UniProtKB/Swiss-Prot annotation:
Record InterPro entries: GTP-CH-I_C/QueF, GTP-CH-I_N, GTP_CycHdrlase_I, GTP_CycHdrlase_I_CS, GTP_CycHdrlase_I_dom
Family statement drawn from the similarity comment of this UniProt entry: Belongs to the GTP cyclohydrolase I family.
PROSITE patterns: GTP_CYCLOHYDROL_1_1
Self-association and partners: Toroid-shaped homodecamer, composed of two pentamers of five dimers.
Protein name: GTP cyclohydrolase 1
Organism: Agrobacterium fabrum (strain C58 / ATCC 33970) (Agrobacterium tumefaciens (strain C58))
Amino acid sequence: MDAIVKNFPGAGAKPDVAEARPSQAEAEEAVRVLLRWAGENPAREGLLDTPKRVAKAYRELFAGYELNVQDVLGTTFEEVGGYDDVVLVRDIPFFSHCEHHMVPIVGKAHVAYLPAGRVLGLSKIARVVEIFGRRLQTQENMTAQIARSIEETLKPRGVAVMIDAEHMCMSMRGVNKQGSTTLTTSFTGTFKNDPAEQVRFMTMVRNR
């Protein structure tokens, strides 16, 4: 049976910004200040264009602040052959930045849900991970945000999210433990209430 596309309002709007965004020139000057603070000379040849490059890179790295998750999740499909079992998208690569030190977080996300009459396009799940990843984050918060946005928009029987990531704030500084990763999970609905469904999710993620 052909899918029927419907639009629904969803969760995950762009975060509120307390103040007006600084100008490009102000952002570039802030980079020059940091370079001087680090002991560098922003006027030397190799650093002349660095402020502009950093500002451009940050606009890309933090593009999630410009995007609204509900715009991604607002379109769902009905009448997909009566399918009502687990939908899992695993090994979604992502990067984010630690909100405490503004250094990278690199990992993979695994996202599953149990449909209740509607399903999402598979690319939409990966897109949600990307949007939340391209913001300053803690891994715990990002895990919960992904689950909550799908839960509130799709209204499935349950959502399961697992993130496995390495934090450069632990690898490059502080305790300097390269290769250590952090695992977080978030469950809603049936996944939260039924341990057997949690085990099934974990098994599906790990089976290759």
